[in-house]
Each structure stands twice: as structure tokens, then as C-alpha cells.
């Protein structure tokens, strides 16, 4: 029998317990031994819930129990998740987590600690909820040089942008609706300002490129400045607006960014709507591949966590997950990153054509969408070149990158 302890009985923790209990025959069969949840750690009481029988309030009860083989961390945040995880690994216990903050900040250290003690630290659910993208990068795509990762990695913001697109609603209205439905937190800052996908693209890039990407180095822009008027232009162009976490590995170096993009129907992420996530990966041999599914939610995320539990159950006394190098990735300076841009501007295309062309080169103009303004799409420019041009165009209303 393999005993599991779950740290935290919130949405994901309770989902892990449910998946293991409901699908126990399948989970245990795939693990090669019976999987049992022996403990759940939480400060709260859960009267009337069967979990009350295995509930403990002191982490030492778990870490000192030699029968506990695997610990599942679902508390979120860095502290005390970091301290509990490190202590568990040092005690020779395997740990898996859905905690992107923990992995983005401390992933290399915790994987190294796991290796030192002959156990594993896994985090499949930290980036794509139920989408098995990390295992694919670690196992299936090991023959490829990964050239690009681009993804819709946050269900909350994808829901908001999808609703703004389909209903023509403004940002604040759709955000409140998302909060009322439980898709967005009361404090939605991590989602709408892009901090959540920033950590996720940092983790995926570290896995794919084999070196540490610091999320603090990633240029990050949220969706709070996207308006219903922006979608009027997108519809005219047959495009949609999505927020991407993206990184590229080219001969010039590695770049990374989180920002809204306007994309056409030919983009494989165009059809990823509502709360779903999609992650595009390009390898130098495989070419393009797509991972699609529920990027959040109780049971989809718990399913990915339990996948790690099963993997660790098969390798209880050996370290199988690869460790990326502690060498920090020095990102291409933001001003040198290349993008194309959609721009909204006051005035008319006829009167502004010469000035716009002088500042940005050849562009495609879009007129007749909103009275008193026009739009245009640039060719590929560096961020620095575009910013210099934008300073000289006070009539500019907004800009959104295109892909």
C-alpha cells in the first residue's frame, strides 16, 4: 500500500482526495499498488465530511510518519508551502504540487533537494491545470530543440476576453460576471494583470530550454486596458484578442513576454474560448503541436496532480524527473524583441497616412469602424522602434500586438 498525505483541503486538495477515492481501482492499478489517502492537513474543521476522520492540523504528524510515501501540496503561495515541501523531501518523501508560485520561485532548489534524497518533486498541474504539457516536454519531446511555447494559460482572462468578443460587453461588466460565477477571484489581480501566466511561461520555458527562467525578468502586461471598441476592430479583421504567455528560442537568444495579442483564424489558438486553455509548442523536428483542455478547475487540475502521484508511486525510491540548470536565462532585452502591432488612432487614415508611414513603415489601414478614428497594423518591428514611433504619435489611442 502507498500512503498519500494531502496538504490543504481547498478546491484542489479536495479534488485530489475525490479523484483518488472515486477512481481508486484505476489509480491503484496504474500505480501498481493500492493508493490510499492517509492524512489531510488543514487548519479548519470539516464536520460532516468523511475527511474529518483523517484530518490533522500539525504537519509534523505527516512528515514523521514513516508510512507516508507521497505528499501532495495544494495550499498555494510560497510560505509555508516551501518549508513543508523541503522538509518532506529531506525526510525522503516524494512531493507533487499544483502550486505555480512555489515552482516558479523555488523549482530548481526543490528538484535538487529531491534528487539528493532519492525522491521526486513533480508539478504537472502547476502550468496547464489538467493539460499534460510538462510531461510531454520532459518525455515525448526530448528529441527536439523547442523553438517556441505560446499559450492561453489562464482560464479567467480567456473567459473575460471570450465574453467581450461574443457579447460586445465592456471589461468591468464581464469581470463582475466572472466573479459571480466563481471563475475570477474577489481580488483578480494575479489573473487580469498577467502575473499568473507569467509564472507559468517561466516554468514551461525552464523545462523546455533546460535553464532557469526568472519570472521577474519577463515583460508582463494584463488585459485591463482592453476595451469593447478594440473588439470592434478585431471583428472587422476577422480576428480575436487573447492574452498569451509566450517564449521563443532563436539564434538571437531567448525572449519571453506576457501580453494581449490580436490573432487571426489561422492561428491554432484562435478557437480556444471560454475557460479553456491551449498551449502551442514548436519543436525543430516535430514542428507544431497543440495541447488543449481545461486549464483550471477542481477535478481537471486534481487529475493532473494524481497523474504525478501515480508516476511517483511507480518510482518511489528513484529520482526520475529531469532538473533544469540553475544557470539563469538572460532574456533578449525587451526593446529588441520583435512584434507587429495593431494601433487605434484619432483622426482619419487619409489625413494621417503620410505621418504613420513615416513613423512605422508600410502599414495596413483599417477605416470605417468607429467615427473619428482609424486603425492600422504594422509590419514586424522591434519593441524599441515601435515605442519611439508611438512617442511621436500623440493621436494614438491604444495598441495591441498581433501574432
Residue map of PLM features:
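Catalytic, metal-anchored helix/loop core of enzyme active sites in primary metabolism
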Residues: 146-150, 158-161, 165, 177, ...
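Rossmann-like NAD(P)H-binding beta-loop-alpha module
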Residues: 68, 115-196, 203
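Rossmann-fold NAD(P)-binding glycine/threonine-rich loop
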Residues: 81-87, 91, 100-138
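Substrate-binding/catalytic subdomain of NAD(P)-dependent oxidoreductase enzymes
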Residues: 175-271, 276-278
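Conserved active-site and cofactor/substrate-binding residues in soluble primary-metabolism enzymes
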Residues: 7, 11, 15, 35, ...
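A short hydrophobic/small-residue beta-strand
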Residues: 95-96
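N-terminal glycine-/serine-/threonine-rich beta1-alpha1-beta2 phosphate-ribose binding loop
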Residues: 1-91
Amino acid at each position: 500500500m502507498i500512503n498519500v498525505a494531502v496538504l490543504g483541503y481547498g478546491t484542489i486538495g479536495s479534488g485530489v482526495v475525490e479523484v483518488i477515492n472515486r477512481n481508486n481501482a484505476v489509480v491503484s492499478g496504474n500505480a501498481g499498488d493500492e493508493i490510499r489517502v492517509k492524512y489531510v492537513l488543514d487548519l479548519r474543521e470539516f464536520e460532516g465530511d468523511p475527511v474529518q476522520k483523517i484530518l490533522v492540523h500539525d504537519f509534523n504528524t505527516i512528515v514523521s510518519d514513516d508510512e507516508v510515501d507521497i505528499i501532495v501540496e495544494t495550499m498555494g503561495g510560497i510560505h509555508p508551502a516551501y518549508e513543508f515541501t523541503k522538509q518532506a523531501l529531506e525526510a525522503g518523501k516524494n512531493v507533487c504540487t499544483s502550486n505555480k508560485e512555489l515552482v516558479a520561485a523555488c523549482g530548481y532548489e526543490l528538484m535538487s533537494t529531491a534528487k539528493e534524497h532519492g525522491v521526486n518533486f513533480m508539478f504537472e498541474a502547476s502550468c496547464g491545470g489538467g493539460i499534460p504539457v510538462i510531461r510531454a516536454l520532459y518525455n515525448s519531446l526530448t528529441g527536439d530543440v523547442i523553438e517556441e511555447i505560446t499559450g492561453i494559460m489562464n482560464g479567467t482572462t480567456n473567459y473575460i476576453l471570450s465574453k467581450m468578443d461574443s457579447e460586445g460587453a465592456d471589461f468591468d461588466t464581464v469581470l463582475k460576471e466572472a466573479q459571480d460565477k466563481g471563475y475570477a477571484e474577489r481580488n483578480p489581480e494575479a489573473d487580469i494583470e498577467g502575473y499568473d501566466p507569467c509564472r507559468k511561461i517561466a516554468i514551461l520555458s525552464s523545462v523546455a530550454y533546460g535553464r532557469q527562467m526568472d519570472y521577474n525578468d519577463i515583460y508582463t502586461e494584463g488585459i485591463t486596458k482592453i476595451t469593447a471598441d478594440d473588439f470592434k476592430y478585431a471583428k472587422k479583421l476577422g480576428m480575436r484578442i487573447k492574452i498569451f504567455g509566450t517564449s521563443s528560442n532563436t539564434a538571437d537568444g531567448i525572449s519571453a513576454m506576457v501580453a494581449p495579442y490580436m490573432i487571426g483564424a489561422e492561428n491554432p489558438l484562435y478557437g480556444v474560448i471560454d475557460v479553456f486553455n491551449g498551449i502551442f509548442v514548436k519543436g525543430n523536428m516535430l514542428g507544431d503541436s497543440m495541447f488543449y483542455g481545461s486549464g483550471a478547475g477542481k477535478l481537471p487540475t486534481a487529475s493532473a496532480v494524481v497523474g504525478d502521484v501515480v508516476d511517483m508511486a511507480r518510482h518511489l525510491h528513484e529520482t526520475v524527473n529531469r532538473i533544469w540548470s540553475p544557470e539563469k536565462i538572460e532574456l533578449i532585452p525587451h526593446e529588441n524583441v520583435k512584434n507587429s502591432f495593431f494601433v487605434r488612432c484619432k483622426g482619419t487614415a487619409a489625413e494621417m497616412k503620410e505621418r504613420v508611414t513615416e513613423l512605422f513603415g508600410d502599414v495596413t489601414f483599417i477605416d470605417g469602424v468607429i467615427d473619428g478614428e482609424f486603425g492600422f497594423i504594422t509590419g514586424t518591428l522591434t519593441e524599441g522602434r515601435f515605442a519611439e514611433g508611438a512617442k511621436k504619435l500623440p493621436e494614438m489611442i491604444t495598441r495591441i500586438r498581433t501574432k
